[in-house]
Amino acid sequence: MALSKRELDELKPWIEKTVKRVLGFSEPTVVTAALNCVGKGMDKKKAADHLKPFLDDSTLRFVDKLFEAVEEGRSSRHSKSSSDRSRKRELKEVFGDDSEISKESSGVKKRRIPRFEEVEEEPEVIPGPPSESPGMLTKLQIKQMMEAATRQIEERKKQLSFISPPTPQPKTPSSSQPERLPIGNTIQPSQAATFMNDAIEKARKAAELQARIQAQLALKPGLIGNANMVGLANLHAMGIAPPKVELKDQTKPTPLILDEQGRTVDATGKEIELTHRMPTLKANIRAVKREQFRQQLKEKPSEDMESNTFFDPRVSIAPSQRQRRTFKFHDKGKFEKIAQRLRTKAQLEKLQAEISQAARKTGIHTSTRLALIAPKKELKEGDIPEIEWWDSYIIPNGFDLTEENPKREDYFGITNLVEHPAQLNPPVDNDTPVTLGVYLTKKEQKKLRRQTRREAQKELQEKVRLGLMPPPEPKVRISNLMRVLGTEAVQDPTKVEAHVRAQMAKRQKAHEEANAARKLTAEQRKVKKIKKLKEDISQGVHISVYRVRNLSNPAKKFKIEANAGQLYLTGVVVLHKDVNVVVVEGGPKAQKKFKRLMLHRIKWDEQTSNTKGDDDEESDEEAVKKTNKCVLVWEGTAKDRSFGEMKFKQCPTENMAREHFKKHGAEHYWDLALSESVLESTD
């Protein structure tokens, strides 16, 4: 006998499990073939022949189990038909399914629906996201739960049928059919009612649990969106109406119950421990998160780097762990020696400061420093030379000065005549008369321009009169069109206007071409600018010497170097402690601009990084005295330049600085600047 589609659907899960148990894996082809055999009503032999290509040796065993399952399903459906009406009534009381009871009461015979099968008319399901929430039962899960409950009932019935023998009943037409069923499928009415009550109770508990879950999810609508509505719709689809849970009850906190001793207990009187939430620091929270992250990294499986194309096994990966530091023990007395050295240094500095202070008060310090500035002499201080330097020119070498009355002829250059030294031309000829330019007024300039233009026009007229050049075309404009052309303008005004406009465009083009021809090129403009900045120094070079107390700021160094280069000035900057000498050479205009830069534009009193620490240690008076500033030491002229392009020279000692100037023949610049610095420090 062929089975219906509904019976095949109920049998399909069992066939899938049996195929997986027989073959060791699931095979949809075998399941489909087995369902076709049962659906077409084949006997065991035909079914075995049909399934033999798929199962081989296990065909007969699988076919026997398949037909036993079919017979058991039929017998269970016949045995449940007698208690169908009472079961529906109980389901109505539990789940409130009025639609099915109304259909039964109409008297029209409908198709019988198994106890846990889905109803045909499903309520409208609210669409949700494709992925279900983990805490929500889906339609498939509820169905599987119902099937598991049904299997438990069937197994329980089998166990009870083996334990207790069936009670004899009189043979009646109504009971003749159950007698033909197998013994394992017979059940007493009282046992059926007990099983039914158990199933109803389980279904009620599942519905209540699902309702609680949906109520909790309803309190947090942003958590899973509309997915919580899918579970409620699935409950209605299964024929279960979950009880409504009031949201206001869920939002209220659990009541606190205390016993006589003040301990927290639950409803049964058992002592419970409440969770105490204590405030903590963000640092502790970050530490916990950091530890969790490290744990996840440890649990994360390492990637297979060898499969990477760029993997090089020769390169070793450095471990990320920090290397442990070993102990370093100090020798005994090490810090005592360091402290003693520091104390000795402090005492020495204090003694030097006292000596320097006493020298400043007596003036010895100033005279000593000024004496050191002068160049070294071959003779010692206090020695009397044999011949003074002014006598060395007239006394010959090897002259014996021990004679009492030397002769006049023995001396060189002594005559009765007055010797006049040869006159030398000055390096700069300042006797040239300076002619002042004549500056005309605006009225005189216009008059001179008119006269020049009139003379040029007169020459052109003479050339035209002599026939040396054709007469120029009349200068026609839109304003004098009718006056110049006359009848021609009246006959064809459009043609005349076009002719006039063409002449105007021609004159404009000639004017622009003349301007472009007079315009200097980029190279010519560059040469003109350089010529303007480079002044004529053939009559003498103007020199300025500046002294700066502190020139450690790189920004100020850059300003000096950049402006000297832009003004085409030469010179040198010698860097020494408290005496920084800047020498610049160039024309008078460039010197004027550079002087304004050094004395006004640069703010020298701004505190620099090097003077910051010194000012903290010194007193207020010394700090005022040592305020950074720039002083013009000397300015004048010389015949030639002594230095090249502007450069910086670091000189730790005074001798080194003087030697650098002496190499260029300008050591007197350093002596002058240093002497002024010494005199200023003693004031």
Swiss-Prot record:
Annotated GO biological process: mRNA splicing, via spliceosome; spliceosomal tri-snRNP complex assembly
The record's account of how the chain is modified after translation: Ubiquitinated. Undergoes 'Lys-63'-linked polyubiquitination by PRPF19 and deubiquitination by USP4. 'Lys-63'-linked ubiquitination increases the affinity for PRPF8 and may regulate the assembly of the U4/U6-U5 tri-snRNP complex.
Superkingdom of origin: Eukaryota
Cross-link (Glycyl lysine isopeptide (Lys-Gly) (interchain with G-Cter in SUMO2)): K139, K244, K252
Biased composition (Basic and acidic residues): 73-107
Pfam families tied to this protein: PRP3, Prp3_C, PWI
Protein's cellular compartments: Nucleus; Nucleus speckle
Keywords: Isopeptide bond, mRNA processing, mRNA splicing, Nucleus, Phosphoprotein, Spliceosome, Ubl conjugation
Modified residues (Phosphothreonine): T167
Ranges where the record places region Disordered: 73-135, 153-183
Region (Mediates interaction with SART3): 416-550
GO cellular component, one term: U4/U6 x U5 tri-snRNP complex
Binding partners and assembly: Component of the precatalytic spliceosome (spliceosome B complex). Component of the U4/U6-U5 tri-snRNP complex, a building block of the precatalytic spliceosome (spliceosome B complex). The U4/U6-U5 tri-snRNP complex is composed of the U4, U6 and U5 snRNAs and at least PRPF3, PRPF4, PRPF6, PRPF8, PRPF31, SNRNP200, TXNL4A, SNRNP40, SNRPB, SNRPD1, SNRPD2, SNRPD3, SNRPE, SNRPF, SNRPG, DDX23, CD2BP2, PPIH, SNU13, EFTUD2, SART1 and USP39, plus LSM2, LSM3, LSM4, LSM5, LSM6, LSM7 and LSM8. Interacts directly with PRPF4.
Function: Plays a role in pre-mRNA splicing as component of the U4/U6-U5 tri-snRNP complex that is involved in spliceosome assembly, and as component of the precatalytic spliceosome (spliceosome B complex).
Protein name: U4/U6 small nuclear ribonucleoprotein Prp3
